[in-house]
Amino acid sequence: MDLLATTSAAAVSSYALLSTIYKSVQALYAQPAINSSLDNLGQAEVVVPAVDVIVPCFNENPNTLAECLESIASQDYAGKMQVYVVDDGSANRDVVAPVHRIYASDPRFSFILLANNVGKRKAQIAAIRSSSGDLVLNVDSDTILAADVVTKLVLKMHDPGIGAAMGQLIASNRNQTWLTRLIDMEYWLACNEERAAQARFGAVMCCCGPCAMYRRSALALLLDQYEAQFFRGKPSDFGEDRHLTILMLKAGFRTEYVPDAIAATVVPHSLRPYLRQQLRWARSTFRDTFLAWRLLPELDGYLTLDVIGQNLGPLLLAISSLAALAQLLIDGSIPWWTGLTIAAMTTVRCCVAALRARELRFIGFSLHTPINICLLLPLKAYALCTLSNSDWLSRKVTDMPTEEGKQPVILHPNAGRSPAGVGGRLLLFVRRRYRSLHRAWRRRRVFPVAIVRLSTNKWSADDSGRKPSVIRARVGCRRPVAPRH
């Protein structure tokens, strides 16, 4: 049994050494630059490129979709902005139809209705090929943008060498359950440690899908590769954000992170959907890691350490945990060294995160360690053994129809008209009424909510079986800007 104890101690010691080096260097590079290009650009840059915002949605809750679209409509961007909402063959179009009607007369909004569910990637591509802006912002349909997100991402994209940039993600439903609180802290660490350090070298390895901006000229070069991703002869239908980011880096473009472009997204509130999400992400990470390895010689040495730390670290932790468990079950002896080392590493990381974020709640992130060891590490092992499986686990994807009668339906607004209808007029009234909340929202980063009642006689039951009678719409806290043509 000495072999098990030695294996466990050696693996956990190696894990501690690797993690200490990796996290220390990461924390050093993750510190914000003293003179950021964003600060300098705010005074010098005057070019305002056209931006196309793409919102793919599939069976989205109407309340959530309304909040997303209203946050986009309330952007303070000074340039031209067009919004393309892509309904990816949703079965609940009758339910979301009132949300569409709110923006049906806004010349900035267009709706692309796909006949069948073809997946997020092809839904994005349908909108990209229907649009023409200089920059393309992808926004998930369950994401709410702060009012200045488009402006700040555009400022970062002023350098033609930058192909993509992402904003900081937070959990909009953070206070819902203990799990959503953990995920919110996980997002903060992923953005402000991992992405921030990678951005120091212009090589963010994954510009997250909920809020990522791309340069159209770069997309034009990569769109065919992006659309036709295959793994072991099978089409890959998830992990589109990571794959597109890797393609950008492979083509020689830089990828950046903008920490003050805040986007709040809905995160899983229970373990089952969370584990399904983590399984998809693990598969896409392993697939694209093979591509990332080929890029490392062309990137800074830190990126090599980053890839090694993210892949070898979990492996060492898994080996030490398995050996410690076997030692406990077979020999009956407690693996003190392994347990104390993991506990010490967890405590130090959580304390450092609490100091950097200036929030004591990060001490509670220590709860993530047992979840990682007991659930996520076995899940990653399963993902590695099932890399060829491209199932979303939550929906089925079909091929894009090619028959003439089943082409995507694009509903363009009637240009020159202001939002009409009871819902549209009421929404504009609510915008004007709550201007004063803008300063409070900016101080506390709270998204004000207004209730918008839509007069309609036809509703379909939502997921809970109840007939919705209210749509909650996020409202901007400034006067609506006149539509730009």
Curated annotation (Swiss-Prot):
Q: Name one GO molecular function term.
A: hyaluronan synthase activity
Coiled-coil spans are none
One biological process term from GO is: extracellular matrix assembly
Identify which top EC class this enzyme belongs to. Answer: transferase
| EC number, as in UniProt | 2.4.1.-
Topological relation to the membrane, as annotated: Peripheral membrane protein
Alphabetical keyword list: Cell membrane, Glycosyltransferase, Membrane, Nodulation, Transferase
Domain of life of the source = Bacteria
The disulfide bonds in this chain are: none
Where in the cell?
A: Cell membrane
**What GO cellular component is one of the record's annotations?**
plasma membrane
The yes or no answer to whether the keyword Nucleus is present is no
Where does the UniProt entry say this protein principally localizes? Answer: membrane
Q: What does this protein do?
A: May be involved in the synthesis of NodRm-1, a sulfated N-acyl-beta-1,4-tetrasaccharide of N-acetylglucosamine which initiates a series of events in the host plant species leading eventually to nodulation.
Regarding protein family, the annotation reads: Belongs to the NodC/HAS family.
Q: Which NCBIfam families match?
A: nodulat_NodC
What's the protein here called?
Answer: N-acetylglucosaminyltransferase
The primary gene name is nodC
